[in-house]
Curated annotation (Swiss-Prot):
Assembly: NDH-1 is composed of 14 different subunits. Subunits NuoA, H, J, K, L, M, N constitute the membrane sector of the complex.
Native organism: Syntrophobacter fumaroxidans (strain DSM 10017 / MPOB)
Gene designation per UniProt: nuoI1
Known role: NDH-1 shuttles electrons from NADH, via FMN and iron-sulfur (Fe-S) centers, to quinones in the respiratory chain. The immediate electron acceptor for the enzyme in this species is believed to be ubiquinone. Couples the redox reaction to proton translocation (for every two electrons transferred, four hydrogen ions are translocated across the cytoplasmic membrane), and thus conserves the redox energy in a proton gradient.
UniProt-recorded name of the protein: NADH-quinone oxidoreductase subunit I 1
Lineage, broadest ranks: Bacteria, Pseudomonadati, Thermodesulfobacteriota, Syntrophobacteria, Syntrophobacterales
GO cellular component, as recorded: plasma membrane
Main location, first listed in the record: membrane
Amino acid sequence: MGNLKEILEGGWSLVEGMRVTFRRLLRPVVTVQYPREVVTLSPAFRGHIELKSFADTGTHKCIACGTCERMCPSNVIKVQGTKAQPKGAKVATHYVIDFTRCSLCGICVESCPTGTLQYSTEYELAGESRWDGVIDLMQRFEARRPQSL
């Protein structure tokens, strides 16, 4: 009688397990087969930092004030700029950020007085070496910018 009870309990356990398996099998797939499928991003996604292009000027408005550099808790931002005209405002010439150490806290975006920093929607930043994460945002901005005729 003891063996029959064990067989029935084992059979019931098998039926219960198959019920759970089939129930999960009929649900829609949640896993995204990245990189074969494109990942749908949330509107609240905060990627890495990039320079924003303004429609009125067609360029960024970074004045190389260094506020973002001073406010960065990770100390990964280096900004350099020059004055285009003797009595004019400074214009950023280099905006280098080390994304391998950046915590993406967003303090630089919030503290920018001209609002020229924004979060990117790009999420594929893999590289072959550590130095691939050190990026000059000015070069990336110029590469993204449409060339005028």
